Structure formats: C-alpha cells, structure tokens
Amino acid sequence: MIYLKTYFYSPHEIKFLKLNLLEAYDYIDKFIICEYNMRHTGLPSKNDYIFEEHINEFPEELRDKIIYLKCDIKDKVIPAYDNEHIMLSHNVRLMRGYFQSQLEFEDEDIVISVEADEIIYGHKYPDILKSVEQHGSVALNLWQFFYKPNYLWINKDWVAPNIAKFKEHKNEYPANWRYGPITFPERVGCHFCYCMSVDEM
C-alpha cells in the first residue's frame, strides 16, 4: 500500500490538502489526514476537530481515498509554550508519528509524509516511488514559497518531507517521518510557507 500522510490544524490548510489529494490520487492507495486536539505548544487547539465540516470541499470522486483520524493527544503532549526544544523534540514528533499507533501497516508499505502546506507534484510520484524502492527512505526537496503562493524564495531549498518504507521507522515511536539519509536530486513540489492572511496567522 502507498499512503500520503499529513496533519492539519486550521481551515486555511484545506486548500493545500485538496491540492495534495488531486496531485497524488492516481499514485496512492490512501490519504491519511490527522487532526489533533492539541497544538505544538501543548495548549488546546483553537479548532476542535473541524475537518468533517470541510469534507464537502473535496471533489466527491476523490474522497474514497481519505482516511481521517481524529486524534486525542491531550494526555500525551508536554506543555512547551516557552520551550522550543520540547515542542520540536516531543510534541511535533508525536504529531508526525501518532498515525502509526492508529492504523496497521506492513513492512513494505510506503508512506509519503508531508506537512499540510507541502505539495508533491503528481508527475514526480513515479520517480520518488522508484527512489524509495532503491533506498528505503528519501528526503524530498521542494520549491519554497513564502507569505504568498507566488512569492518564490529564489535559491532556497526546502528539504524536509520524507518518503519511506514503513519498516524504516516501525521500531521508532513516535517516529519523526522527516528528512532522510539521502535527498532526492530534483525538486518535486512546493512548500507554501505562511501563505495565509494576517488574521489566519
């Protein structure tokens, strides 16, 4: 099985989830979307499980591949409002890897792990899937857009999303599902960093 996996926290990210599903649909078996009741800081989410309110924004013919996980992690996060180290090493890592505890996977399953605003080009899927068969785990390089979706950050690499066989991370929990031992040699998509209004921030 081939899975695209992400998590989201805000209505402004729905458009990115739709883009990822549209690009990936012909190449994946399922799109795992996790929504959490807590934030990276360890504080409660401002929006309590809103994904189902937006499901009708996805084309009906594409919804069959969505697996929506409503994730309660209030007893698992650590308060980290003033502690970036704990926020990144524990809370963020938990949110990236929590899906492992909610579904069953086989060793040879492939997981493409992206943040909500990281979009993989559909035409690059055959190449990255071939690469993961050869290497087991690969970091993906994206074009970086900042603040507006047409503000390209020239000469900026964004190397963070990971594509890996499940067996590469199955003995870590929660696994970070970021980066990788090698980086795919071409840019394979776009990262829309802080592409939102001031109110949405």
Segments (PLM) and residue ranges:
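Active-site-proximal specificity loops/subdomain of glycosyltransferases
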Residues: 36-113, 122
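A short acidic (Asp/Glu
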Residues: 15-19, 42-46, 79, 120-129, ...
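Short His-Asn-centered micro-motif
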Residues: 5-11, 34-35, 113-116, 140-143
